Amino acid sequence: MSIFDQFPIELLLLLFSLFTLLFAYTIQRPSTHLLRTQHTLLVEDILQHDQFLKLKEYRHHTNHIYDHARRVSYLSFRISKALGMDYQAAARGGLLHDFFLYDWRERKQYDEKRSSHGKEHPFIALENAKTYFSVNSLEEDIITKHMFPKTLALPRYKESVVVSISDKISAIYEYVVRA
């Protein structure tokens, strides 16, 4: 049983609000260039991999999955680093969380339930991540639980919660701000 099984939804919403405030704070700090460099060094093997680069061919909302994954990864890295968490796992898991190699909108046309992508793609992403990279158990949890609460399995680690929230913040940004 995960520690997150004990928390009510209100507490998770409060955490979401706190992470949003922390995000706004960390973006304005002067050491952004140094942090971007640190982040890139942690994930450059993934960013340069031929299979991962294929994500540039698939759309997310208003951008490519590649760009979305980079944003989620960097935001997760910044929050995890600021809170003293495993920022390397957050950065790598955040980058690999949507590592599926198909156009989900085309698939949605043929999906009778019109909902399977949201529940299945974390496991497809994990399978791809394990095929091309070394993935530890924390990164596995990050990848498979990033769709919480759409998927009912609760995140096991605090870094998984950070990536899940970062994914939602990034999707909102892409959908609303960049529309």
Where are these regions (language model features)?
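Metal-dependent phosphohydrolase cores
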Residues: S2-A179
